[in-house]
């Protein structure tokens, strides 16, 4: 699926895993993207406070969530978790967001940045950077649909 290139804005990108969330953000003109330290996921979602601090610190206006679809473009168990987390985060942060198919982003970041067997979360944040770069090139635009901040996937 091809989307229109989105309008420039400062965006946070999330690569959501079961243990950590990789983070990256772009400048308001979508020219440069930078990684942030990955955050640990907690059962009570206390990592949202850390994410909120980054949103405020960098004056970010929305976020994107990588959705790991399978080779055929179908939802996986992890994709459902990512989609639900994105909706939860949008409700907590009151920000618009979108989903991006992030199939193979971890493999690509490992190959592109030479990261192997990483337990620090660095590979997760580089994966978030790849997701962000994909969004900058392809979209979709962040939207609010029917009062809920989401894009149907």
From Swiss-Prot:
EC number(s) given by UniProt: 3.1.-.-
- Extract one GO molecular function annotation from the record: nuclease activity
Q: Report the subcellular localization.
A: Cytoplasm
Principal location class? cytoplasm
InterPro entries noted in UniProt:
RNaseH-like_sf, YqgF, YqgF/RNaseH-like_dom, YqgF/RNaseH-like_dom_sf
Is Cytoplasm found in the keyword set?
A: yes
> Kind of enzyme, top EC level?
hydrolase
Q: Name one GO biological process term.
A: rRNA 5'-end processing
Q: Which Pfam families match?
A: RuvX
Sorted alphabetically, which keywords does the UniProt record give?
Cytoplasm, Hydrolase, Nuclease, Ribosome biogenesis
Q: Name one GO cellular component term.
A: cytosol
Which family, according to UniProt?
Belongs to the YqgF nuclease family.
Please explain the role this protein plays, according to its UniProt record. Could be a nuclease involved in processing of the 5'-end of pre-16S rRNA.
What is the official name of this protein in its record? Putative pre-16S rRNA nuclease
Source species of the chain = Prochlorococcus marinus (strain AS9601)
């Amino acid at each position: 699926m091809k989307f229109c290139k989105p309008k420039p804005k400062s965006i946070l990108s999330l690569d959501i895993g079961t243990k950590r969330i990789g983070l990256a953000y772009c400048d308001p003109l979508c020219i440069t993207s930078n990684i942030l330290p990955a955050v640990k996921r907690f059962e009570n979602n206390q990592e949202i406070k850390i994410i909120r601090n980054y949103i405020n610190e960098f004056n970010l206006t929305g976020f994107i969530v990588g959705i790991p679809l399978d080779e055929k473009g179908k939802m996986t168990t992890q994709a459902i978790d990512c989609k639900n987390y994105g909706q939860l985060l949008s409700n907590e942060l009151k920000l618009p967001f979108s989903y991006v198919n992030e199939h193979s982003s971890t493999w690509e970041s490992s190959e592109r940045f030479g990261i192997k067997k990483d337990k620090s979360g660095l590979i997760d944040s580089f994966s978030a950077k790849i997701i962000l770069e994909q969004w900058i090139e392809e979209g979709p635009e962040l939207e609010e649909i029917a009062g809920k901040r989401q894009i149907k996937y």
